């Protein structure tokens, strides 16, 4: 932990020494954001909305680039292309460090300050990023597993809809460690209907499964709720999902889902742009990862966000927000 913090601080000092300040720093700044998820997904839409808001407020230019599908090679090419343009800053998600290491390190070597978001909490410093804005995926999974166990779950599914995304692997690993029961990692397609069918089939084959963790609200969380709803009242299956959508918040408020794990994606888009602006204009920046989650959202909080009454109170609806587990100074 200390080594990571020292590495982050050292990288920041080196970049500041190379960049300098003055009139050039006051020119209109241009940043590029490369992520592995598109704005068609509510999670990434919130990130883009936050980044666009920060850019508008700060008077800077922001260009967003995303592969057409989850394609690590294509994403690496986008990072390389962005670095070649020598932007004032690069914001990037890191779903797989091995696949993106060369491109990100190349950007850093070219003198482009890099901030990672969403995926990459545990590897950002080693790749030369100034810091990461997001959450520890392992810790978030562990918090979810522990809470699911408290709610009475004994046998669970962890739905992985994006094979090759190491951050999702870490979520499932944390969930397994926190749950301390039987957990099956179930690979599913990144298509909601296919997810619903896969969950339905698995639940019908194994009547002992009483908990499901989805790693995306829109791709897997909603379909998991639909699959369990179709089982009727004769069986209790607890559902939790990473991230929030209106449908998931309604499901949590109605106690069809136990809780959601919120990592505040708007902040993951907004803060990096503002931090890069501050870096150029004031020469200041965080010296460690910036935590935006995890926060567990239960029925009361979900209803509040929707502006509606929560369902009748039960033990499973009373999920209180939690603080992230400390794994690194300045991080979640």
Tell where the protein language model's regions lie, with residue ranges:
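Hydrophobic alpha-helical
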Residues: 92-108, 175, 184, 189-250
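Extracytoplasmic "Venus flytrap"
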Residues: 30-54, 58, 63-79, 85, ...
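Hydrophobic alpha-helical segments within soluble ligand-binding/sensing domains
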Residues: 131-156, 193-196, 244-248, 264-281
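Bacterial N-terminal signal peptides
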Residues: 9-19
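Short, solvent-exposed amphipathic alpha-helices that sit
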Residues: 42-57, 140-144, 166-183, 198, ...
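Flexible loop/hinge segments that line or gate small-molecule binding clefts
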Residues: 102-139, 243-254, 258
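Short beta-strand elements in bilobed, periplasmic/extracellular small-molecule ligand-binding domains
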Residues: 56-69, 157-158, 175-196, 211
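Hinge/cleft segment of the Venus flytrap/periplasmic-binding protein
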Residues: 27, 179, 267-332
